[in-house]
Amino acid sequence: MKKLLSLLLFILIISCKQSNKSEASYSINELIFVVEMNSNEGKSIEEIKEFSQYYTDAIDKNEPNSKGWGFYEYGDKIILIERYLDDNAMMQHGKNVSEGGPLEIQFVKFMEHFTINKIDVYGNASDELKEFVKPFGLPFYFHSAYAKFSRG
């Protein structure tokens, strides 16, 4: 009986420690960008797929605080979903694709493949981020969260 109680106590302690680990892995400042685009005239579906993989790989390699990245078919449009750890991670992405940034060439190619129709931003974006994106001249729409969670 004593061994059984010891075992149950041990399991209880371990489960509490695991619970704390999962709480620590929440990302409370995550931002999600949903970019609606059209493929540019003259670009085949195969070219779009190949470039999408190329660009996704470049982001994965160069931006450790980009939590996720994916291009998706949406009828005659393309949806790009970008997930960022926080405002700073997104602003770093903006700097990376800007003139002189490590992804400048890739972004020029991006704009050769796609026309951006709108960018919906989900999460609590700071005023600093909202000001940062203005010079890009793209149609950003910000949507603050009422309630959300994101795991690490």
Task: Please provide the spans of the model-predicted regions.
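Mid-chain, well-packed structural core segment of small domains
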Residues: 92, 98-110
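Sec-dependent N-terminal signal peptides
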Residues: 4-13
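Short S/T/G/P-rich N-terminal loop/turn motif that feeds into the first structured element of a domain
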Residues: 16-78, 85-95, 112-152
